[in-house]
Amino acid sequence: MDQAALRAGISPDAIVSPAAFVAPGASIAAGCRIGPGCVVGPDCVLEEGVELLAHVVLDGRVRLGAGVKVFPFATIGLPPQDLKYKGQPTGVAIGARTQVREHATIHRGSVGGDGWTRVGSDCLIMCVVHIGHDCRIGDGVILVNNIMLAGHVEIGDFAFIQGGAAVQQFVRIGRMALVAGMSGVERNVLPFGRVKGYRAKLHGLNTIAMRRRLGLSKEQVMTVARAVHDLYRGGRPEEHVAAVAAAHPGNPHVAEVLDFARDRGRHGLCPFGRLGEDDELDG
């Protein structure tokens, strides 16, 4: 194939290493840099300023937002690990300025979802993280090294998942939640919740994020903490939503927690763990 045809979808302002392979049909915007050993499939779209450092593989329908940076040996858009998948045209979409570090794997969606695995903007996906098919990752999420997300996991904005954690399929993790390292998450995690353990349990609130990112006072954090205490006061938390809502009218942060709790999904909420000296739920 002649060079003019090969570059038909490549901006003249993009820099592509002669040791990279960009398939005809790929769209490479201005300011992109594609390093040696990279492979970019024909259905990939790279917006302005995307950087693939070296030995990165993009396959299937991949959409990388402006300023995304992908480090060596990461793979994005390979087929899902789903025996029902038979080659349907599914994909991965990643928002602007997200970084994907070495050896991370992000699989394309499946026909069991809407066909897309989605990662938001301004995320940090550290080394050897696996994001399974049909996951939904919000903006500003940090996934530390060696995390495993099964298919259809949902993670809210600004959540922080520490290294080595494993999350079961269809689990939902709320906004600004914190999952401790090496935890096994089998049930949903409330917004602002802090969970840990081999079978993860709620051990407090992510009070640092609530204060720094939301600007909440200690008293405001304590109000949310009391609502969470009441939610877990015997029986299933979902059974207490109405009573807790009545006790905290007009509080948007309590309302966010309760809206999340109402949708039990497939797994329900993480159980409440016994608080220890390293835990806090009262801010």
Q: Can you describe what each PLM-predicted range is?
A:
Residues 4, 9-201:
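Structural signal for interior beta-strand "rungs" in well-ordered beta-sheet cores
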Residues 1-13, 18-19, 31, 67, ...:
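Terminal amphipathic alpha-helical/low-complexity segments used for targeting or macromolecular assembly
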